[in-house]
Amino acid sequence: MRLKTILLGFCAFHVARSKMVVNLINMIDEQTGEQRKVVPLELERFFPLDFDEILLRDTMQRNAAMEEEDYRELGKRDIEVAFQNTGVTLDDRLQSLPAISLFGRYVRDIDGMSEALADGDRHIMVFAPTNDAITAMPKKPWEYPRNIDKLEQAGASASEIHDAIQANVRRFVLTHVVSDIDLSKVGREDGSAVLTSDLHPKSMQGDILLRKDGDRYTVSSKTGRDLAVEEVHTASNGIVLVIDSSLDAE
């Protein structure tokens, strides 16, 4: 989003709007008469548990840091100041985190996936296995469920093998992505949410159980294993949850 603010000898505040989180509204402080940006009482929600609040907090912190930098530069620029905050999308965020760089490469290998994760109008959760988790898998994402060794032994063409590898990688990535969640259809228990990965139709019963216990999150896969969420990273159009194992390990 691109806004242009004219500063006429006084300090004007700008908080960039985020499609992801909330549109701040203007209120007048009755005691001081000053205009303030505040959060509406009803926060528009796109994600389960408390992830909308996490997004709001991180967005406001980033915007505050941007404002501070902009105002430090005022003495070096004309009085007219252009503010720009397009935000870091999930596609960029995945590529910026070294601990999940392998998963980021698999994402880039899937046609259309980078474009989806770069779409600012989407609301997406990504459960990204660490490099160590992927390296420790008995079979790598491109090796199953289509058995590449057997295809080669059977004399499959290079094109057939390539297509099988692409299908395997796509399946692996989609198992770890949840797009545009319909919260009215999310199965809930106290402190938990049942989500459906992009591998399956939204009408299908969920295959990911996300739980919160205090300040910690865990994820249960279809195999029933509890995986620890090691880190949570926000982007302008979603959340990255770094997990210590694959949701689809063979």
UniProtKB/Swiss-Prot annotation:
Domain of life: Eukaryota
UniProt-listed PROSITE patterns: FAS1
Cell location: Vacuole
Gene3D superfamilies linked to this entry: FAS1 domain
InterPro entries: FAS1_dom_sf, FAS1_domain, Mug57-like
S-S bonds: none
Extent of the signal sequence: 1-18
Family matches, as Pfam families: Fasciclin
Keyword annotations: Signal, Vacuole
Domain FAS1 span(s) in chain numbering: 87-247
GO CC terms, sorted: vacuole
Keyword Lipoprotein appears in the UniProt entry: no
Protein's name in the database: FAS1 domain-containing protein AER383W
Organism of this sequence: Eremothecium gossypii (strain ATCC 10895 / CBS 109.51 / FGSC 9923 / NRRL Y-1056) (Yeast)
